[in-house]
């Protein structure tokens, strides 16, 4: 029963922290005019979202970090998961800050984000001491050598940006992360990695608490502060459970959901080339 008790406690605590923080944070973000910027070239149906508070990821990520540190001892794997998540949190926060405070709609340049993610990947590779083999279904373990580190960067960049692209549509990013985190929680329990299972459960709880305020009509968006960090956290779990091969499939399915949602909310659009954030 212990294997389910701690994850359940993490879901409840993280959801409670976000639910308690949201009624206080949303008015503050309104007061500071930290509103969502909608690109003029984007779908006209999304213009009504302009001004909706963003940077809600602050309460999501802090709730996850507090929850796992309260419930679990800080192991190397848990520390690495937190490092990757908080590194992407810092990147996302800076990106949102430039958008909403400096009023520059594009935020950080793509190459600046990539540089930040390369640094995070290098730190992960240095501290983790991960084996360089990749498990492939029906083929077993394949040693990639130094190619593994290129794969690690691809997983971090691809997964974090896949979540990032789903933000800005009511409930889509948080709902997507809940589904992926639940799946990874079960994988972690199956592998006997209880601390990582608690980490995934905290992600589920925090996103459930956030979904109450992000469901249509959204009162707040997580912004890059939350979406990049949650994507980075999922990538971290994939790397630490050595299931990196699953991440591209998850990223592709996330983008397909975003495409479908964009078409449903903007039927005249041929392609969701623009995110609303």
Mark where each language-model region is.
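A cross-family signal for N-terminal binding/gating loops and helix N-caps
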Residues: 30-35, 47
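Hydrophobic alpha-helical hairpins/lids featuring a short glycine-rich hinge
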Residues: 74-109, 113-114
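Juxtamembrane helix-capping/reentrant segments at transmembrane boundaries
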Residues: 38-52, 103-116
């Amino acid at each position: 029963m212990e294997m389910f008790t701690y994850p359940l406690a993490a879901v409840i605590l993280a959801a409670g922290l976000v639910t308690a923080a949201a009624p206080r944070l949303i008015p503050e973000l309104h007061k500071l005019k930290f509103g969502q910027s909608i690109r003029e070239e984007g779908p006209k149906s999304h213009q009504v979202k302009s001004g909706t508070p963003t940077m809600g990821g602050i309460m999501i990520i802090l709730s996850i970090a507090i929850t796992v540190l309260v419930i679990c001892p800080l192991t190397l794997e848990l520390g690495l998961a937190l490092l990757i998540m908080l590194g992407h949190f810092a990147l996302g926060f800076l990106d949102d800050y430039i958008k909403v405070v400096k009023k520059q709609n594009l935020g950080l340049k793509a190459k600046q984000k990539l540089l930040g993610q390369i640094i995070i990947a290098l730190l992960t590779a240095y501290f983790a001491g991960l084996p360089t083999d990749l498990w492939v279904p029906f083929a077993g373990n394949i040693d990639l050598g130094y190619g593994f580190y290129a794969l690690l960067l691809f997983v971090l960049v691809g997964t974090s940006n896949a979540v990032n692209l789903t933000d800005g549509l009511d409930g889509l990013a948080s709902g997507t992360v809940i589904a992926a985190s639940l799946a990874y929680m079960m994988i972690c329990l199956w592998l006997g990695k209880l601390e990582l299972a608690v980490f995934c459960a905290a992600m589920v709880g925090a996103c459930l608490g956030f979904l109450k305020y992000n469901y249509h009509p959204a009162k707040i968006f997580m912004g890059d502060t939350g979406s990049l960090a949650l994507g980075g956290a999922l990538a971290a779990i994939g790397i630490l459970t050595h299931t990196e091969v699953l991440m591209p499939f998850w990223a592709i399915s996330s983008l397909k959901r975003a495409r479908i949602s964009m078409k449903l909310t903007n039927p005249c659009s041929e392609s969701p080339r623009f995110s609303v954030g």
